[in-house]
Structure formats: C-alpha cells, structure tokens
Amino acid sequence: MERGQDTPWTQSTEHTNIQKRGSGQQTQRLEHPNSTRLMDRYLRIMSPVGMHKQIVYWKQWLSLKIPTQGSLKTRVLKRWKLFNKPEWIN
C-alpha cells in the first residue's frame, strides 16, 4: 500500500494538522486527535492527588470485577432478604 493513501482506519485514528510557515508554505503533520488530551490526563493522574483518585477508582473497579468474600456475603444476604420478604411467602 502506498504511503499517500489513507485507509479508513488511519483516517479514523489520525488527523492531519496543517500549519503555515512564514513563507506561506503548508506543512502537514499526522497527529492523534486526542494526543494532547491524553497527555493532560496522564499528567493529572501522575500528580499525588490524581494518583490517589486513580488508585481509589481502580480499587472500586476491581472490587466489582473480583469480589472479596465479604462483598460476596453482603450481596448474597441482600438477595436473600429481598427474596424472603413476607409478601412473597404468602
């Protein structure tokens, strides 16, 4: 495949950033559309406060994906209480 041809994949993942030089000549630079946003997010996460928030978020996410024995017990008890309500028994 020639370098000049864009596939749908490259069109969707990259965009062309056109800049004008002092002489009026245009230069093109391929850049990921979210690269600056990704870098900003990375810098925020790597700050001490951002790092703490990220750790808390991942702990919450992991507790949903890999439940501990305590959280499983809580879930089972809640389900059991809902299932054994008096109006369901009659």
UniProtKB/Swiss-Prot annotation:
Sorted UniProt keywords: Apoptosis, Host cytoplasm, Host membrane, Host mitochondrion, Host mitochondrion inner membrane, Host nucleus, Host-virus interaction, Inhibition of host innate immune response by virus, Inhibition of host MAVS by virus, Inhibition of host RLR pathway by virus, Membrane, Modulation of host cell apoptosis by virus, Viral immunoevasion
InterPro entries, alphabetized: Flu_proapoptotic_PB1-F2
A family per Pfam: PB1-F2
Region of interest called Mitochondrial targeting sequence, as start-end residue ranges on this chain: 65-87
Polar residues biased stretches: 7-28
Chain segments carrying region Disordered: 1-33
GO cellular component: a single term: host cell mitochondrial inner membrane
Coiled-coil regions listed: none
GO terms (BP aspect): symbiont-mediated perturbation of host apoptosis; symbiont-mediated suppression of host cytoplasmic pattern recognition receptor signaling pathway via inhibition of MAVS activity
Domain of life: Viruses
Compartments where located: Host mitochondrion inner membrane; Host nucleus; Host cytoplasm, Host cytosol
The protein's role, per its UniProt record: Plays an important role in promoting lung pathology in both primary viral infection and secondary bacterial infection. Promotes alteration of mitochondrial morphology, dissipation of mitochondrial membrane potential, and cell death. Alternatively, inhibits the production of interferon in the infected cell at the level of host mitochondrial antiviral signaling MAVS. Its level of expression differs greatly depending on which cell type is infected, in a manner that is independent of the levels of expression of other viral proteins. Monocytic cells are more affected than epithelial cells.
Subunit: Oligomer. Interacts with human SLC25A6/ANT3 and VDAC1. Interacts with host MAVS.
Further information: Is not encoded in all strains, and seems to be dispensable for replication.
Family classification: Belongs to the influenza viruses PB1-F2 family.
Protein's recorded name: Protein PB1-F2
Gene (UniProt): PB1
